[in-house]
Amino acid sequence: MAIKERVGIVVSNKMDKTVVVAVESRSPHPKYGKIVVKTKKFKAHDEENQCQEGDKVRIQETRPLSKTKRWQVINIMSHSS
């Protein structure tokens, strides 16, 4: 089975070694066809505490690390200005 990867924006880094990443998905409405943007938040493991709010990051699914944390940060694609 393929390992899931997502790209999103860091919305919170207040926890130790954990960031909250908001991932947007765009899909057409089943009846009306308009593109609907849905946002889902994932808690991801950030071992070195490098991520800042607003950074664009790539996260990868991993084994459960805590009650709600099942993703880890692979790399920081761009830093916030």
Swiss-Prot record:
Gene Ontology MF term list: rRNA binding; structural constituent of ribosome
List GO BP terms, alphabetically. translation
Which of UniProt's keywords are assigned here?
Ribonucleoprotein, Ribosomal protein, RNA-binding, rRNA-binding
InterPro entries, A to Z: NA-bd_OB-fold (IPR012340), Ribosomal_uS17 (IPR000266), Ribosomal_uS17_bact/chlr (IPR019984), Ribosomal_uS17_CS (IPR019979)
Q: Which Pfam families match?
A: Ribosomal_S17
- Which Gene Ontology cellular-component terms appear in the entry? cytosolic small ribosomal subunit
Q: Which CDD domains match?
A: Ribosomal_uS17 (cd00364)
Q: What does this protein do?
A: One of the primary rRNA binding proteins, it binds specifically to the 5'-end of 16S ribosomal RNA.
Record text on subunit structure and interactions: Part of the 30S ribosomal subunit.
Membership in a protein family: Belongs to the universal ribosomal protein uS17 family.
**Protein name in UniProt:** Small ribosomal subunit protein uS17
